[in-house]
């Protein structure tokens, strides 16, 4: 079997790239997906009568009009609802005036530092004092270690109460294995702006991603990817994974023995999930340095008394790090689902749970150099990494689609 473009993975990256080629009149491609259905981390299943997104919480951010217009070709805009994000943090804090040391549960909107005004004044005062003393506000040099950097950036109290425990739950037990290079985009937490926010009783600063988002009216987020997969007809192979890539001859061998020769191989799958034949030892060693986490998505059938779309839980006394309140964005549904790093997950009898072996690429200290080396080697062999796993970067689906569209524009002229 031969194709000019052999596309590995039928998630948002692979599906977008393939459909862009098709839309340009290029039909010399084939897509390989190991699962029986396409969508990758954005797949949905019907659970308790309604869709559940089995790869976590995925929504279509409105900020990239070109991406939205592209996806609306497969699932028209009138089939989506548009929401203003309501995300919150549930945190247990000891009231400063308490003599017992017992914690009390508080809820505030995300991001934490922009919504301190929602807490009691005694808590506001504590956080304001901590922010004023933060290293980034006092000319102290930027620390090298992750935990020290978080404290330097946000102040010791936000770090201790929220950022450090939450990131520990979501990413790694030893946070100092993570680098700090990916945190530089976070704005400084200004004492003056935080104080003014508390006085005016409103959030300050720019809002996080998905401030406004689309979600299907009648389906899960996986529906749009299913429709994109259907457009590919016999150019899509499902239900069989990739065993190896012959980097010298650009031959992909599938687990069932099928061999596909390509002029270009577009890989959207994790690098450590496939054998790279003819790759030198230093490349294989670099791949071993690319780390990731697994998650378990578990459905809970009870309705919660909240308007939030999702809620973050930094408390180390519970396994999961966030919940997605399905009933607030999926019309006619009930309940919610939890997202838990698999290392922390403790299955209970009767759990309805889905495990994603590859959920989040980790921004470890060694990652930038390692992935750069892998991608450089691969590209010289006409193997191109694309998307969350091909580039080993924590891209949301809209970013992945955007990158796939741009790559297709570039490759169409090759």
What are these regions (language model features)?
Residues 13, 37, 272:
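Conserved Rossmann-like nucleotide-cofactor binding loop
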Residues 81-83, 235-239, 352-354, 384:
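General small-molecule cofactor/ligand-binding pocket signal
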Residues 22-47:
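Glycine-rich FAD pyrophosphate-binding loop
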Residues 48-138:
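Dinucleotide-binding Rossmann-like beta1-alpha1 core, especially the glycine-rich loop
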Residues 128, 132-250, 268:
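Active-site/ligand-binding neighborhood in enzyme catalytic cores
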Residues 24, 241-250, 254-359, 373-377:
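Mid-domain catalytic core of redox enzymes
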Residues 3-31:
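N-terminal Rossmann-like FAD-binding beta1-loop-alpha1 element of flavoenzymes
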Residues 44, 325-414:
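Conserved flavin/dinucleotide-binding core of flavoenzymes
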């Amino acid at each position: 079997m031969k194709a000019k473009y052999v596309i590995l993975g039928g998630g948002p990256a692979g599906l977008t790239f393939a459909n862009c080629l098709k839309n340009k009149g290029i039909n010399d491609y084939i897509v390989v997906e190991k699962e029986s259905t396409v969508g990758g981390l954005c797949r949905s299943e019907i659970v308790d009568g309604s869709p559940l997104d089995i790869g976590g919480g995925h929504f279509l951010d409105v900020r990239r009009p070109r991406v939205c217009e592209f996806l609306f070709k497969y699932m028209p805009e009138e089939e989506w609802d548009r929401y203003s994000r309501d995300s919150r943090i549930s945190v247990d804090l000891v009231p400063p005036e308490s003599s017992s040391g017992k914690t009390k549960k508080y809820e505030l909107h995300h991001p934490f530092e922009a919504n301190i005004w929602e807490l009691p004044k005694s808590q506001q005062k504590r956080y304001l004092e901590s922010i004023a003393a933060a290293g980034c506000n006092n000319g102290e040099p930027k620390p090298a270690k992750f935990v020290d950097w978080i404290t330097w950036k946000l102040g010791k109290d936000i770090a201790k109460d929220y950022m450090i425990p939450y990131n520990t739950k979501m990413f790694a037990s030893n946070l100092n294995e993570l680098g700090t290079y990916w945190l530089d985009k976070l704005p400084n937490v200004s004492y003056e702006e935080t104080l003014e926010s508390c006085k005016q009783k409103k959030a300050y600063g720019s809002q996080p991603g998905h401030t406004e988002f689309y979600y299907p009216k009648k389906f899960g987020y996986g529906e749009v990817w299913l429709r994109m997969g259907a457009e590919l007809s016999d150019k899509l192979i499902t239900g069989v994974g990739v065993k190896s890539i012959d980097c010298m001859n650009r031959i992909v061998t599938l687990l069932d023995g099928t061999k596909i020769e390509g002029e270009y191989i577009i890989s959207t799958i994790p690098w450590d999930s496939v054998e790279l034949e003819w790759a030198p030892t230093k490349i294989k060693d670099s791949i071993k340095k690319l780390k990731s986490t697994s998650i378990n998505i578990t459905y809970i059938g009870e309705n919660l008394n909240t308007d939030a779309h999702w809620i973050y839980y930094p408390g180390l006394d519970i396994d999961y790090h966030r919940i997605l309140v399905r009933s607030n964005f999926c019309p006619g549904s009930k309940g919610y689902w939890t997202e838990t790093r698999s290392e922390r997950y403790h299955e209970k009898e009767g759990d309805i749970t889905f495990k994603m072996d590859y959920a989040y690429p980790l921004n470890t200290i060694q990652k930038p150099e390692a992935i750069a080396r892998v991608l450089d080697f691969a590209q010289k062999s006409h193997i191109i990494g694309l998307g969350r796993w091909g580039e080993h970067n924590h891209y949301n689906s809209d970013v992945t689609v955007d990158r796939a569209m741009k790559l297709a524009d570039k490759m169409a002229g090759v």
